[in-house]
């Protein structure tokens, strides 16, 4: 299959995803830079105090709410993970993860890209209070990685973009498993049973193919609360909810009705302004088209811009700000070195070595249209951990280990920046080299 055929095989949904995530990556970067500037300016005290401001409502002596930081990390990030869960479900059912042949190479790459960074970090920080941060360099920020690829444009094969997206989706799934297994404390089984009950109700709704999103979202709020109270991070509830959202398209006459409405619109007279009849027809077309979409597609379409242009940039602005002064101890255990080496060295080596060995052992096969040099380049870009790595660092280090958290954030920013620059320069040079050979 040549590059032209691969280009044609890339679905419209995937193209839109690349575009939105790429622009989202640039916006994320600007918010991270702004956070660092503000955190090291005369506004730093106001900046840090802002995130500890309680937000909610008071009933007598009882306060219902969280600090702004918790609203972002626990509530808004749950919406982000809901979108991630929807993307994973779609890819598992219809996309690049829908068959073993398609999924094996990027999934194996994702596994290698998580194990190697985690081992590097753990080896450097074993038997220290910071060893629990091994999950930090395991993550990949798809928005940033695709932002870099967008800047490279046609210098990057489309097949490599597909591979990187699929790898990142598998990486997100791995990150969810890591959070559930290693960053869960003080389990409360009564709340877990409550969560299980909600999941069973959601499963029944899915089985009955209830297409309205309202009952799913209302039960999702209840599920979030039960999981939050159980000791498991609440974002896991969002992923579970995503897998319960129906994906079936209704089998009815709405597509025929759409064609008839289209013919009616074409037959109406056109002028400078739409007539009342044309407006009514267009409104009907919009309603029928929306009804043809599955609940999963509707929810994903709704969440994508909110996540890309509001939730993740806000998360970056709230979490990337680190005050770099003489009081910060960069030598806390080996956190700085562990995170940077994990992202910059562990990611590309893990992805390259495990896929190379797997192909030699005939476990999987490299996608057509990309070379091993391209795989190494994708591995470098996968070292951009940023938002996902920061999210895990917030779970790994408590307030008692604040120094390690601050150092981890600096390391994430440095490691992600180094990986992005080296990855971009490497792929640019690779394209130049290929052009000279022609």
From Swiss-Prot:
Transmembrane domains' residue ranges: 23-43, 62-82, 104-124, 133-153, 162-182, 185-205, 221-241, 302-322, 337-357, 372-392, 410-430
Record localization: Cell inner membrane
Coiled coil feature spans: none
Major location category of this protein: membrane
Catalysis performed (reactions): Na(+)(in) + 2 H(+)(out) = Na(+)(out) + 2 H(+)(in)
GO MF annotation terms: sodium:proton antiporter activity
Pfam families: Na_H_antiport_1
Keywords of this entry: Antiport, Cell inner membrane, Cell membrane, Ion transport, Membrane, Sodium, Sodium transport, Transmembrane, Transmembrane helix, Transport
GO biological process per UniProt: regulation of pH
Listed PANTHER family: NA(+)_H(+) ANTIPORTER NHAA, SODIUM ION/PROTON ANTIPORTER NHAA-RELATED
Cited function: Na(+)/H(+) antiporter that extrudes sodium in exchange for external protons.
Protein name, UniProt field: Na(+)/H(+) antiporter NhaA
Organism from which the protein derives: Helicobacter pylori (strain HPAG1)
């Amino acid at each position: 299959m040549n590059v032209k055929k691969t280009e044609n095989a890339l679905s419209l949904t995937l193209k839109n995803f690349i575009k939105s995530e790429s622009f989202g990556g640039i916006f994320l970067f600007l918010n991270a830079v702004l956070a660092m500037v503000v955190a090291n300016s005369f506004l730093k005290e106001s900046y840090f105090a802002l995130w500890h401001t309680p937000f909610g409502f008071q009933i007598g002596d009882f306060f219902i709410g969280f600090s702004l930081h918790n609203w972002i990390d626990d509530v808004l990030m749950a919406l982000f993970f809901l979108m991630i869960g929807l993307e994973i479900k779609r890819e598992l059912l219809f996309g690049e993860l829908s068959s073993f042949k398609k999924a094996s190479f990027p999934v194996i790459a994702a596994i290698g890209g998580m194990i190697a960074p985690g081992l590097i970090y753990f080896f450097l920080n074993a038997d220290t209070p910071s060893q629990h941060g091994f999950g930090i360099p395991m993550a990949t920020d798809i928005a940033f990685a695709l932002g870099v690829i967008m800047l490279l444009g046609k210098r990057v094969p489309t097949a490599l973009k597909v591979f990187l997206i699929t790898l990142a989706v598998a990486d997100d799934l791995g990150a969810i498993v890591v959070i559930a297994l290693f960053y869960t404390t003080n389990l409360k089984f009564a709340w877990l049973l409550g969560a299980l009950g909600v999941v069973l109700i959601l499963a029944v709704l899915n089985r009955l193919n209830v297409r309205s999103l309202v009952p799913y979202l209302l039960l999702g709020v209840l599920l979030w609360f039960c999981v939050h109270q159980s000791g498991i991070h609440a974002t896991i509830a969002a992923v579970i909810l995503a897998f319960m959202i129906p994906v079936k398209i209704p089998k009815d006459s709405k597509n025929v009705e759409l064609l008839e409405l289209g013919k009616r619109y074409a037959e109406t007279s056109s002028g400078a302004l739409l007539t009342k009849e044309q407006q009514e027809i267009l409104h009907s077309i919009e309603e029928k088209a929306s009804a043809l979409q599955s609940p999963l597609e509707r929810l994903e379409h709704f969440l994508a811009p909110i996540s890309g242009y509001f939730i993740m940039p806000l998360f970056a602005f709230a979490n990337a700000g680190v005050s770099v002064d003489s009081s910060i101890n960069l030598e806390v255990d080996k956190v700085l070195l562990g995170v940077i080496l994990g992202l910059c060295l562990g990611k590309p080596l893990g992805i390259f070595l495990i896929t190379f060995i797997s192909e030699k052992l005939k476990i999987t096969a490299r996608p057509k249209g990309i070379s091993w040099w391209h795989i190494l380049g994708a591995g470098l870009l996968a070292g951009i951990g940023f938002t996902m790595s920061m999210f895990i660092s917030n779970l790994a280090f408590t307030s008692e280990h604040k120094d390690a958290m601050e150092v981890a954030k600096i390391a994430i920013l440095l490691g992600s920046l180094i990986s992005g620059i080296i990855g971009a320069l490497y792929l640019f040079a690779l394209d130049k080299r290929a052009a000279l050979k022609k």
